[in-house]
Each structure stands twice: as C-alpha cells, then as structure tokens.
Amino acid sequence: MAILLFCTAACSDSYLELSPESSVSDEVVFENADAAQYAVNGLGRIMSTQYLDTQGYNGEGTVYAYQGEYPGDVIQKGSYTGWQNLAKGNYFTSSTNSNIHVTWYYYYKLIRNANQILDNYKTGLANVAEQRKWDYVKAQALVYRAYSYTMLSQLYSRRWTDADGLQRGLVLRTTVNNDEMPCSTMAETFELVYRDLDEAISLFTSCGYDRPADVDKRWMANLDVAHAVYSRAALIRNDWQTVITHSQEARRNYSIMTPDEYKAGFNTANQEWIWEVFEDDTQPVHYYSFYNYMSASCLGSASRTYPPCISKQIVDPIDPADKRLAIYAIPTPEEVGDVSKVSGSGKVTKGDFYNRVKKEFAGRIYSTTTIFYYLSTKFIVKSGTGDGCIPIFRAAEMMYNEAEAQFRLGNEQAVRTLLEQTVKPYNADYTCTKSGDNLWEELKAYRKFDLCNEGHSWFDLKRWGDPMVRKTWAEGGSWATYFAEKNTTTGGNYGPADKNAWTAVIPTMETNYNSLVSNVEKIKSDGTWDRN
C-alpha cells in the first residue's frame, strides 16, 4: 500500500493554519483532493480544542475524563469534593447540565464536519489518481462519523441488552443540514456505523493509500483505525464474532509496548498506539487540556492539588510482580497504618510514604503536587502547560475486546491465551488457569488495570451491567466516604438500573430547536422505546 504522499504538507503544523470555516467556500476547500485532505486533518484538530468557553472541555479528552473515568470505579480525583455530582453520575437526567451538553456538542461538531467532507466527495473522475485520493479522503471522514456515533451511543442510549437494539438511538445526520429530525433506534444507529465502516474499509483497501508510517502521524485515520472502531462498536452491540474479526485486523500491525514504554508517560505514540489525539507544545490548549485533569505533573491546580488516584480495588487483584504497578504510588500496610485515621481520599502531608513518593516519583509529578495514597502517574505532561497526546485505541484494548467476545462465545482457552499475551510482557511468570466466573473476573480486572485513566471505566461497567461498587478505607478500599455513599439516587454506590439506567438525557441544545426529539425517553413495558 502506498504511503499518503499527497498530504505530506497537510500533516505538518500548517494544517492548523486554516481560515474560519464560515469564511471559506466549499468550492475552495474542496477544489481537489489535496485541498480536501486539509479539511480531513481539521477533524483531528477538533478532537483537541477548547469548547463552550469552559475550562476542562477539550474535545476527546473531556469525554475520557468526565464520562469515562470520573464516574467510574477505577480513578478518583483526590479530595475533589466539588465534583461529587460528576463523580457519582448524578447529572444523567439534567438536560441543561454542561457535562451533558459538551459531549453531544463535540461529537455532532465532528459529525457535521465529516458530513461536509462527504457531501463534497467527488466520484466518477476520469483522472484515476485523483479519484483514489478522493476515495482516501472519504474513507477517513466515514471513520470519524462512525466513531462519533459509536461514542455517543454509549452515553445517550441504554445498554444493547436492555432492549436488543430497540431502545432509543440518536439523531442520525448524514448530510449538512439543520432540518428537524427524530431519533433512530439503537439498532439503526449501529446499522449506519457498520455501513460507514464497511465502505471505509473497502475504500482504504482499493485506493492504495495509507497514512505516513511515522508514529507521530497516528492521529490520522487509516484502515487499522476503521477496524478498531468496528471492534468497539461491535462490542457495544454484543456482536461477538464481529468483535473478534476486527480486533484481530486492527492490531495486526501493532505490538504491546515494553515496560519502559509503558512507564514513559503515555504522552507520545509508540508501537502499540493505533489512533491518538495529537497535542504538543506547538498547539496546546493549556489549562483546558486532558493532562491538566488526568495527570499529576501539570502545573495547573486541577492536576497538582487534585491528582488522579487509582482505586485500591483495581490494584489488589494484580500480581505484585507486574511492572506496570510502578507508575502508581502504592502504600504498604505499614505506611498506611490505622485506616480510621486516613483523611478523605488518602491525602498525606508527611511521613515515610510522603518522603518515598517525593523521592521515587520526583520526575513524574509536579514539585508541589499534593501526595495521596495510590497516586497515579500514568500520564506525564510533555511540558508544564499540559500538552501531550492521548491514545484512542491501543493493541491491548483490541486484545481485551477479543477476549471478552471469546468468553461470551464460550471459548475460554482463547481468553486465557489472550490474557497471557497482554500480561506476560510485564510479568513473565504470569499464567492463567482460571475458568468460568473466575476467568471473567480475571479478564475484567486486567482490562480495568491496563486501561486505567484512558476513558473506559464507566463505559465498561455500563456495558457489562455491573453495579458501581466503591469501598471506603474502612471497607478495605480507598474511596473517600463522600464518593462512596450507599445511596442509589445520589450516592457513589448504585446498581445498573439506577440513575436512569446510566443513560444521559438528550440535552436542551438539541431539543430546543428540534421539536421531533424529546429529552424524556418513553419506555414500554417490554423495555423497548415508545417512538410515539
């Protein structure tokens, strides 16, 4: 397959230097495929841009932090009491909440821009070389649209198993317009996602182009990315054989990172990253960035004062020999002492643990970072202002996706093999001999641990139909009591049917102008959506 030479200039910093969309006509932007590639590259920039004039709203990173991690069971923001409602998932039924708005706004912005590219796609050209370029442009835009609808469905639609696809889906816009439009079903949403990805895969294969091989071009979509999106979409849809097929295809050209790469800060693409959000000091979003909220090394107060901490419940099942544990400040029982005296999320201001972390993690945290038990240093900023790339897909996720699908199909030996392949690079003595429910728990434990901080926790729990279980220090965990109340309405421990079945209502930014959509989902007695 040929490298995508026609976008070499567009892949440099100059691709950011575009006139505002409203000031450039479609005739200019889509004059030819080379020009259209700049518009495609702009989709990548949308994924790392500040939105709604709100600190912390940075595109893809916001979804990972605010939706995937803070409400989950893997990471808590040390003593960040002001974010209790976000951390406990108490905003799902608030159609005016900005955290509900931002994800809808961001992904539909991506969809609209992808649709603009697709609306201007040129076909039937006599110039074969130019047609192949246009086909590559279209394939990339289709991937962005399919990915956006996949991610939206995880938040704004119920679990696939709740109604086998007959629950409410999304507003499926496939062209640039402002027409009123009703919601689809979830099944119709995934029919579009599959159709877009099938066409993208076909075009990627036939056009003969690929993104440059440099790892710093992993922000560009290609055939592997299309397969990765397919894997995640099929996992949400419980389409197990499809998960297996596309997980294997997606990771074919990638290998698990080494222990040293794993500990290097997760801020730069490497051999394992399939797709990324690109950000560096030439185009930072400063205090709005993902790193300002999910690292312990940024100079912003959200990072220094309230660093992320991995839950003790996530660490405990992992073999102590696993080299990935080194990026977390895990205390010994002696360092913790009397748990009844632990403050909140585990803040420490002096003593043996404090001194050890300050010394051992000096290069991984900011000089004035507040120290907590189980402090996470997985993400390390490239510079103090908060810049750094973010993995969207890694080979490891594809292996966990496949393992989950294999388990659902009863292929337990395949699950054990996949687990060993993901763990042995970090613990050479690891073997998996478990079966049945114990194997399922082992798979979930290593998935949670490996993908920690990367935006999966809450989405995984929702898909599995698992309850939110947060144990306080007194209960053998490490959660602050204000994040772990036993209250299914507003607390931090609740079941899969609570809190609107973990489903966000459609925000008023849609319902205020689209009268065909309501932020109240009517459910029939059989669990399906009442479209009337």
Give the label of every model feature segment.
Residues 26-27, 54-72, 77, 158-166, ...:
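Short, surface-exposed recognition loops and adjoining beta-strand edges that mediate ligand/DNA contacts
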Residues 80-155, 184, 202-204, 384-390, ...:
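Conserved, well-structured interaction surfaces
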